[in-house]
């Protein structure tokens, strides 16, 4: 897989020669320095950025062979994504934010959204706006939103990066527990090498390539 960006007349290669297979239910952590290509790789795997060369196959479907509408529907059904900065809509309540993937799919998912909030321990905060929630609570809402459609694959980009150590530990415990409980494949970008030891496999990304990949002992 290859991915580059243009800055003026210059082309900057961000990913090159990436070959990666992730087993169903595996928990993989992507580590490496800032600018190494971790987030770009995650975006590409999740169908958010098309590679110039290569393909991404999830559940036997070539993600980038699909047209825009089919690709959006596939991502909605098969992929959950958690952002570092939560990406909650400020004018929507917690439950309404969790409903967003269901709304895109044209379904009434209120009951499922409430169930997702209950799984992350926030059923009693369903009608609160993001500004009324702590950082840890906002990230829990983001996790509930990512899991509401029960996707087989979940991507998380520095999910604890904006949290203090206590909230970071609680959020990661929750995320790992929910993934294990549901058999969800989990791919996490993190700078925290200690955190990465909790996965099944740790991959080191350096200068756009996977320079090391090993099972966590």
What are these regions (language model features)?
Residues 1-205:
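ABC family nucleotide-binding domain
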Residues 202-215:
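H-loop (His-switch) and adjacent beta-strand-loop-beta switch element
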